[in-house]
A protein has these predicted regions:
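Extracytoplasmic electron-transfer domains, predominantly the class I c-type cytochrome c fold
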Residues: 68-128, 136-140
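Short, non-ligating residues that shape and space the ligands of small metal-coordination modules
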Residues: 60-61
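N-terminal secretory signal peptides that target proteins for export/translocation
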Residues: 1-10
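Thiol-/selenol-based redox modules, centered on thioredoxin-like
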Residues: 133-138, 145
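The canonical Cys-X-X-Cys-His
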Residues: 43, 47-57, 110, 136, ...
Length: 145
């Protein structure tokens, strides 16, 4: 895997800060389960909007556009299984954020959703992009088979 080393730490720091803010809010309010559900809901919504067309609504890699791609989309519901039983959280985060490319994967096929997210964030319409990438990564972690 190749990595854009300059951008990756910025995203990770922003994601850590977002996690810390969510965590502190959770501790302050004592509403851990509600916060977790909200984060997963944001991630699920982001997945359906940005990923399901290629990866399928169940993340199996069989979305409606899958057969139109040069390389079949990955089954995102089995990432932990394919990684020795451990979900590769930060690797997945980096791929979604566009900070890591996958060897042999034509990166032009997978749009950089983080760029779209940053534009929406700048317009003041959506939560910060790193938080949405983080929520999507947590969602993918939650659906592992």
């Amino acid at each position: 895997m190749a990595s854009n080393s300059a951008a990756a730490p910025i995203w990770k720091i922003a994601a850590f800060a977002a996690t810390l803010m969510v965590g502190l809010a959770t501790l302050a309010d004592g509403e851990e389960e509600r916060t977790r559900k909200a984060m997963l809901a944001i991630g699920s919504e982001e997945f359906q909007e940005s990923c399901a067309a290629c990866h399928g609504t169940d993340a199996s890699g069989r979305g409606e556009l899958a057969n139109k791609l040069l390389k079949p989309p990955k089954d995102l519901s089995r990432l932990a299984e394919q990684n020795g039983g451990t979900f590769p959280f930060w690797r997945v985060f980096d791929v979604i954020a566009g900070d890591t490319t996958i060897e042999g994967h034509d990166t032009s096929q997978m749009p950089l959703f983080s760029q779209r997210m940053r534009g929406q964030e700048a317009a003041g319409v959506f939560p910060p992009a790193p938080l949405r990438v983080l929520a999507l990564t947590h969602y993918l972690e939650s659906i592992q088979e």
